[in-house]
């Protein structure tokens, strides 16, 4: 018993004879100075899929997915039965049948989008009913529409999304990307659309043999309204509430809030709402979710991380987060962010007015005890074992350890380190070299636009002072010609070499010796300041002739007398830039 309590409240479990070494160094440390960690939200859909492939193969190589079998990914049934479809033919029944609690996360997002669209179409439907000529004609129109919808329903392919056509213009991509924002009248609805073609698909079905077209733009965040609303309210009113998520609540008020969210109304929680009622509502949402927030096909893999050292555990959790569907990972990140803010206010502090602010007493361990079993639940795809795992660790204790580590390191879990970015770049290039080039150039344009905006904002705030400071900074960073360091790279040459790298020129893409992706910026590109009229596909080399100033160019009449001394022999020759072979720097000599 003492050993179990030790495991529960210690930072990690006792060392085991066999440990799993995870790819990469310590979490949060960047071993490659040329690249920075980036958020998974900045990755396009194609990059996100390649990131999942990279994490999957890495975890398989480290024996983290030994319990996972891809052949368990069987086709799923239609999410809507015939009886439910008949109930949804009418607008009122359809809106009332779309729930929020007790269903899968994907269905929650789909229902929110459907309810919003239904509210927009309700006035139009009422006008059509008023303008109808006779009741029989209206009944005939209803029957005709019902039969037409039934024909379309039964003629729909098995794995086709169940939303209307206007909802799924980008459904073939499996996830809605930011480039489809202009295709919807209300851009806010875009955030609620999700991976419709991958609905309820286990990890094996998501990774094996996908032939869908992928977007090259980032995926929109997919967070349910109830999670976003409750987290915002708790962050605003509950950070100083002692014992939040554990104090008694009003059951009647929780049921009222639950009914409001089931109706799909745009709920605004004001100061009159008790924060403990909102906290209980959030707990019930995750507890009653049909599928756990952490996918059940990764259940044993998450528990296995509890046997690692803290550094290796966070790295393993990072790879497992990459394998989660976007809607699950986005919702998990939003929840962990709110829980981490609560832990930052667990101790007493002194306020701005000098008064003592009591802490909420909710550490990461206490919060993990509350959400451990709600986030990590054994589902239908998990092996039916006893409560003790093969490693001799209690499931409950292991789940608390995992959730606690995720709360403490929530900001690292959703970042992509440089060495993973390199692997993703390899896989993207192997599938589509043009896509990799497009992504790099797009990121370059974003960086250029951001820097231009920063400069404009600085000049607008104080034009005279900031312009002088900017010029002084540029002059301070520029070095004299005679003090040029040996081998210093030129920004333009490095950028051109990176953007126009020939992968097929006597180099194997899989060979690390021939291709060092550390010098090829993937998601953190060096800004390109070259002229827009220049040809970016031409890489200047040392074989080009140096530009000679017009004042030193000899006339054709004097070329024949090259053996003689020029008229201005007594004057010193001007310094002419000369490309030095094998060096990136530009040397000047007299």
From Swiss-Prot:
UniProtKB keywords: GTPase activation
UniProt cross-references to InterPro entries, sorted A to Z: ARHGAP6_RhoGAP (IPR041852), Rho_GTPase_activation_prot (IPR008936), RHOGAP6/36 (IPR037863), RhoGAP_dom (IPR000198)
Residue ranges constituting the Rho-GAP domain according to the UniProt record: 214-414
A Pfam match: RhoGAP
Region of interest (Disordered), ranges: 526-590
PROSITE patterns found in the cross-reference section: RHOGAP (PS50238)
Biological role stated in the UniProt entry: GTPase activator for the Rho-type GTPases by converting them to an inactive GDP-bound state.
Quaternary structure and partners: May interacts (via the Rho-GAP domain) with the active form of RAC1.
Record-given protein name: Rho GTPase-activating protein 36
Gene: Arhgap36
């Amino acid at each position: 018993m003492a050993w179990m309590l030790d495991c529960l409240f210690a930072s990690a479990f006792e060392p085991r004879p066999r440990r799993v070494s995870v790819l990469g160094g310590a979490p949060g440390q960047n071993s490659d100075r040329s690249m920075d960690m980036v958020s998974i939200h900045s990755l396009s859909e194609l990059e996100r899929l390649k990131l999942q492939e990279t994490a999957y193969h890495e975890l398989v190589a480290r024996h983290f997915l030994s319990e996972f079998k891809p052949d368990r990914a069987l086709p799923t049934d239609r999410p809507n039965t015939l009886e439910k479809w008949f109930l949804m033919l009418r607008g009122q029944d359809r809106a009332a049948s779309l729930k929020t609690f007790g269903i899968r996360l994907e269905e929650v997002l789909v229902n929110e989008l459907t309810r919003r669209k239904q509210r927009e179409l309700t006035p139009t439907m009422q006008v059509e009913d008023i303008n109808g000529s006779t009741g029989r004609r209206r009944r005939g129109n209803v029957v005709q529409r019902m039969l037409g919808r039934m024909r379309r329903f039964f003629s729909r392919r098995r794995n086709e999304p169940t939303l209307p056509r206007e909802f799924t213009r980008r459904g073939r991509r499996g996830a809605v990307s930011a480039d489809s924002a202009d295709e919807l009248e209300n851009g806010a609805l875009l955030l609620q659309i999700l991976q419709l073609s991958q609905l309820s698909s286990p990890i094996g079905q998501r990774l094996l043999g996908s032939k869908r077209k992928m977007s090259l733009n980032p995926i929109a965040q997919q967070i349910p309204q109830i999670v976003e609303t409750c987290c915002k309210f708790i962050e605003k009113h509950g950070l100083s509430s002692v014992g939040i998520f554990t104090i008694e609540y009003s059951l009647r008020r929780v049921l009222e809030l639950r009914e409001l969210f089931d109706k799909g109304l745009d709920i605004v929680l004001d100061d009159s709402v008790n924060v403990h009622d909102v906290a209980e509502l959030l707990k019930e949402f995750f507890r009653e979710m049909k599928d756990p927030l952490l996918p059940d096909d990764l259940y044993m893999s998450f528990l296995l991380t509890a046997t690692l050292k803290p550094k290796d555990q966070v790295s393993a959790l990072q790879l497992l987060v990459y394998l989660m569907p976007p809607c699950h990972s986005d919702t998990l990140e939003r929840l962990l962010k709110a829980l981490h803010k609560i832990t930052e206010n667990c101790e007493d502090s002194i306020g701005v007015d000098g008064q003592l602010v009591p802490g909420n007493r909710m550490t990461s361990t206490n919060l993990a005890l509350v959400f451990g079993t709600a986030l990590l639940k054994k589902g239908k795809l998990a092996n039916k074992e006893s409560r003790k795992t093969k490693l001799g660790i209690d499931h409950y204790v292991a789940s608390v350890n995992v959730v606690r580590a995720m709360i403490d390191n929530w900001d690292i879990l959703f970042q992509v380190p440089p060495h993973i970015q390199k692997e993703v770049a390899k896989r993207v290039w192997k599938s589509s070299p043009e896509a990799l080039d497009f992504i790099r150039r797009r990121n370059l344009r974003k960086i250029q636009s951001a820097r231009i905006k920063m400069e404009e904002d600085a000049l607008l705030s104080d034009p005279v002072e900031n312009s002088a400071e900017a010029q002084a900074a540029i002059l301070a960073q520029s070095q004299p010609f005679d003090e040029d360091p040996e081998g210093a790279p030129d920004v333009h040459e490095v950028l051109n070499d990176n953007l126009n790298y020939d992968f097929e020129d006597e180099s194997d893409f899989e060979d690390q010796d021939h291709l060092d992706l550390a010098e090829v910026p993937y998601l953190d590109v060096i800004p390109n300041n070259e002229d827009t009229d220049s040809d970016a596909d031409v890489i200047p080399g040392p074989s080009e002739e140096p530009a000679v100033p017009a004042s030193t160019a000899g006339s054709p009449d004097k070329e024949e007398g090259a053996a003689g001394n020029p008229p201005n022999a007594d004057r010193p020759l001007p310094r002419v830039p000369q490309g030095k072979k094998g060096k990136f720097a530009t040397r000047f000599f007299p």
